């Protein structure tokens, strides 16, 4: 015959198993809500600046990680004047102040999309907007076009020709663009 004490132990054990499963599910869910990036830039000072500047509330991708993707759609979240100086080849300008979600509604939501701006601040906000409307594989380019340029990757002008000119936003932000010759940065 089963004792009352034995039944209580079984009931408590089953309840604890259910609670453990619920807690585990909650931990997994909550950890996915708070995206933490391991993305890095080459300059320790720039890295420190980005850690403070960005909210890190979207998926971030480093320049090294970008190279792992076979096909990518690049969206430029800078202002048109910045884009006109230079941009990542084949990128689509979507802007920031004038960003309109309708400008990207025809994009395939299952494709990998990387959004960039100068350093990642504006593109982080645009990335969040795309996530909210159902884009699944969208990433903020950590360090933006400045880090792209710093690591020697090509940028092109509006004629599609490779250029060394880069819009450095303003003199203060130009400090994060390295390896340039006098006159390569534009404000």
Enumerate the language-model features and the residues they cover:
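Bacterial Sec-dependent N-terminal signal peptides
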Residues: 1-45
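Short, surface-exposed ligand- or partner-binding patches at beta-edge/loop junctions that are enriched
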Residues: 116
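Conserved G/P- and acidic residue-centered "switch" motifs that form tight phosphate/ATP-binding loops
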Residues: 120
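Rhodanese-like catalytic fold shared by cysteine-dependent sulfurtransferases
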Residues: 17, 33-63, 69-70, 80-111, ...
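Structural scaffold elements adjacent to functional motifs in cytosolic proteins
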Residues: 74-76
């Amino acid at each position: 015959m089963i004792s009352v004490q034995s039944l209580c132990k079984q009931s408590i054990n089953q309840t604890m198993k259910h609670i453990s499963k619920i807690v585990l599910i909650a931990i997994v869910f909550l950890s996915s809500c708070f995206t933490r990036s391991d993305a890095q830039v080459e300059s320790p000072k720039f890295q420190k600046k980005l850690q403070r500047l960005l909210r890190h509330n979207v998926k971030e991708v480093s320049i090294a990680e970008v190279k792992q993707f076979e096909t990518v759609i690049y969206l430029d979240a800078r202002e048109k004047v910045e884009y006109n100086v230079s941009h990542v080849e084949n990128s689509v300008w979507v802007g920031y102040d004038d960003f309109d979600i309708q400008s990207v509604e025809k994009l395939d939501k299952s494709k990998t999309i990387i959004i960039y701006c100068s350093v990642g601040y504006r593109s982080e906000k645009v990335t969040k907007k795309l996530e909210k409307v159902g884009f699944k594989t969208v990433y903020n380019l950590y360090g933006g076009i400045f880090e792209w340029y710093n690591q020697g990757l090509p940028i092109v002008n509006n004629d599609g020709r490779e250029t060394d000119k880069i819009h450095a936003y303003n003199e203060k932000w130009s400090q994060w663009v390295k390896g340039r010759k006098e006159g390569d940065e534009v404000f």
